[in-house]
From Swiss-Prot:
Lineage: Bacteria, Pseudomonadati, Pseudomonadota, Gammaproteobacteria, Enterobacterales
Annotated positions binding FMN: H8, S14, H15, A16, N17, M65, Q66, W67, Y68, T105, T106, G107, G108
Residues forming coiled coils: none
GO function terms (MF aspect): electron transfer activity; FMN binding; NADH:ubiquinone reductase (non-electrogenic) activity; NADPH dehydrogenase (quinone) activity
Disulfide bridge map: none
Protein name: Glutathione-regulated potassium-efflux system ancillary protein KefF
Subunit structure: Homodimer. Interacts with KefC.
Record localization: Cell inner membrane
Keywords linked to the UniProt accession: Cell inner membrane, Cell membrane, Flavoprotein, FMN, Membrane, NAD, Oxidoreductase
HAMAP family, sorted: K_H_efflux_KefF (MF_01414)
SUPFAM superfamilies: Flavoproteins
The enzyme's E.C. designation: 1.6.5.2
Pfam families (alphabetical): Flavodoxin_2
Protein encoded by which gene: kefF
Bilayer topology term: Peripheral membrane protein
Length: 176
């Protein structure tokens, strides 16, 4: 099962993430948990989230990039749900062998994230990659949709279909 942990603080204003979710919903075996809809008060149901994670083979952290990082509710979710003794540490093997895909949208172009005036995309992914590895997850190459503020509808739809294709290819490779 593919579990998408969706963290968009303003989901009604989303163009790119909305299309990505629409494409993902067309696949069988996909569950989407929208953190800002489930927990508008930031009071996360840890047991429910851990139960959802336990059913997943592929976990996707999908969100818009905010200030070169993740939205605050996703950070809190990571801090609370990936707990010691469950996700890491003594006895913390619940996520071992599962896969993690970081699916992120950005307003800037891909070149905006090259080494130079701004941090490189590989650098920006390191905290998430380190978290994944620490929890025994297999880190997959990220999926990034850039220039979302200026893309036309056709481009956004094409990128969303590419996202669906990434998920489908993972399903086919791991479940025949």
């Amino acid at each position: 099962m593919i579990l998408i942990i969706y963290a968009h603080p303003y989901p009604h204003h989303s163009h790119a993430n909305k299309r990505m979710l629409e494409q993902a919903r067309t696949l069988e075996g996909v569950e989407i948990r929208s953190l800002y809809q489930l927990y508008p008060d930031f009071n996360i149901d840890i047991a429910a989230e851990q139960e959802a994670l336990s059913r997943a083979d592929l976990i996707v952290w999908q969100h818009p990039m905010q200030w070169y990082s993740i939205p605050p509710l996703l950070k809190l979710w990571i801090d609370k749900v990936l707990s010691h003794g469950w996700a890491y540490g003594h006895g913390g093997t619940a996520l071992h062998g599962k896969h993690l895909l970081w699916a992120v949208t950005t307003g800037g172009g891909e070149s905006h994230f090259e080494i130079g005036a701004h941090p490189g995309f590989d650098v920006l992914s390191q905290p998430l990659q380190a978290t994944a590895i620490y929890c025994g997850l297999n880190w997959l190459p990220p999926f990034a949709m850039h220039c979302t503020f200026i893309c036309d509808d056709e481009t956004l739809e094409g990128q969303a279909r590419h996202y669906k294709q990434r998920l489908l290819e993972w399903q086919e490779a791991h479940h025949g």
